[in-house]
């Protein structure tokens, strides 16, 4: 892991956290001393801070608004004003503490129990690392992280600090995902060896190079903090902030990172896929100097035999590419939904569903109607956010998109991005997940991790 050693204060606090946790068996201490890992009574409201409050951040905060929104942190004052201007946010106006720099917030606010991180992808892990060292529970908007090494880091550090973790792929908590799992486990599809996943994204710029020049930085925006851990570049209006960063490699994870957490998630979960052993890809042209992801890509993931499950080949399509329409699908029916979908192909039946695992159906419809659905075997969820809150208040409860699961799912998607970058080599990448390395491409191995700008490393 390429980490920045600049800050010693968080390392010292991590050691204090370990010592304090050991003493807690004998002492009664305020919960902020133990950070977010201390006991919180179910009747208490959690002190939640949010880093990144526009877009998905605003939605995540609203979903947790029955708790105490203790602090908001964003590099753009305008996004903070927009969020606090919402009707549901009225109780927090004038009470919620406001920050631009997450490091200052964590330094100054020990009463924070939990953090929602909804920044661009490249900042998820640096913020999470600082928060976990203080014992703060974490909800990270999908995709979980920016590199394969970060996926491993987050899962490991969450275990070490005993925090409650959740990735924000909300479809993972919905009914459809549970039905898909139950039907696959029931044998409705038979042996599955083929999966197809597709999306209508990107709906942001990709396949372009970096424009020259710069624009005046708005007075409401701290551009240096926005760039954060990435190599610094000049500000350009509407080029990166506040939505279009997704296609830029320094900041986002492209289409498979952005939407794979909603689409690959369900077959990945139902088939218990773990990590692929082979990955290959083809794509349209990249942006100049690999600045942005391509406009369209097709990625093949090959998963080995596991127990009684045969090997599985999962193919991802984006940028307008789609799998061949099944002959058994009725002509009047849409394949998936308007945003994308999944086909899980078994030797008995094929299951089709939309994005977020919604509307799962065995096709054709006559086969679906004839199938005797099993009784529920998987606990139903109160929702992706409430799962997290409930698990913080009652540690006997579990989140379902915790960093162990979501880290491995994210690693798989990020391996797909690496295969896309290396597609010009015309080879199938062979991946040794146990040792986190490609065995046949040293160039691909350099893409598993990244460097961090001073002050933003993982301590």
What are these regions (language model features)?
Residues 56-60, 80-82, 108, 204-206, ...:
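Short, solvent-exposed loop/turn elements at domain surfaces
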Residues 2-137, 149-164:
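N-terminal glycine-/serine-/threonine-rich beta1-alpha1-beta2 phosphate-ribose binding loop
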């Amino acid at each position: 892991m390429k980490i920045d050693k600049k800050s010693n204060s968080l390392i010292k606090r991590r050691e204090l956290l370990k010592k304090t946790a050991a003493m807690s068996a004998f002492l009664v201490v305020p919960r902020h001393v133990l950070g977010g890992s201390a006991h919180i009574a179910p009747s208490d409201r959690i002190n939640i801070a949010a880093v990144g409050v526009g877009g998905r951040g605003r939605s995540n905060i609203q979903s947790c608004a029955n708790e105490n929104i203790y602090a908001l942190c964003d590099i753009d004052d305008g996004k903070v004003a927009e969020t606090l201007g919402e009707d549901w946010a009225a109780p927090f106006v004038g009470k919620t503490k406001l920050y631009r720099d997450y490091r200052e917030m964590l330094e100054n606010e020990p009463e924070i129990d939990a953090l929602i991180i909804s920044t661009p992808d490249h900042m998820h892990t640096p913020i999470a690392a600082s928060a976990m060292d203080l014992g703060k529970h974490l909800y990270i908007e999908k995709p979980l992280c920016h590199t394969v090494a970060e996926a491993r880091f987050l899962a490991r550090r969450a275990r070490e600090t005993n925090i409650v973790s959740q990735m924000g792929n909300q479809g993972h908590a919905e009914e459809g995902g549970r039905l898909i799992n139950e039907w696959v486990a029931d044998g409705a599809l038979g042996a599955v060896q083929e999966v197809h996943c597709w999306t209508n994204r990107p709906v942001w710029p990709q396949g372009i190079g970096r424009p020259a020049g710069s624009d005046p930085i708005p007075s409401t925006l701290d551009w240096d903090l926005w760039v954060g851990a990435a190599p610094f570049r000049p500000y350009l209006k509407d080029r990166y902030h506040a939505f279009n960063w997704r296609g830029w490699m320094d900041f986002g994870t492209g289409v498979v990172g952005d939407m794979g957490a909603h689409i690959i998630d369900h077959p990945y979960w139902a088939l218990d896929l773990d990590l692929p052993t082979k990955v290959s890809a083809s794509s349209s042209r990249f942006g100049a100097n690999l600045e942005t992801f391509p406009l369209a890509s097709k990625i093949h993931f090959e998963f080995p035999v596991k127990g009684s499950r045969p090997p599985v080949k999962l193919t991802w399509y984006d940028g307008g590419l789609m799998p061949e329409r099944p002959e058994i699908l009725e002509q009047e029916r849409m394949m998936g939904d308007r945003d994308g979908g999944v086909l899980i192909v078994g030797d008995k039946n094929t299951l089709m569903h939309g994005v977020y695992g919604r509307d799962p159906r065995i096709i054709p419809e006559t086969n679906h109607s004839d199938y005797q659905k099993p009784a529920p075997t998987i606990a139903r969820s109160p929702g992706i956010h409430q799962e997290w809150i409930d698990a913080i208040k009652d540690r006997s409860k579990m989140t379902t998109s915790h960093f162990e699961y979501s880290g491995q799912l994210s690693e798989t998607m990020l391996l797909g991005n690496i295969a896309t970058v290396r597609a010009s080599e015309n080879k199938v990448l062979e991946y040794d997940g146990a040792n986190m390395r490609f065995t046949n491409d040293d160039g691909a191995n350099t893409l598993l991790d990244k460097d961090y700008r001073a002050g933003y490393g993982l301590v």
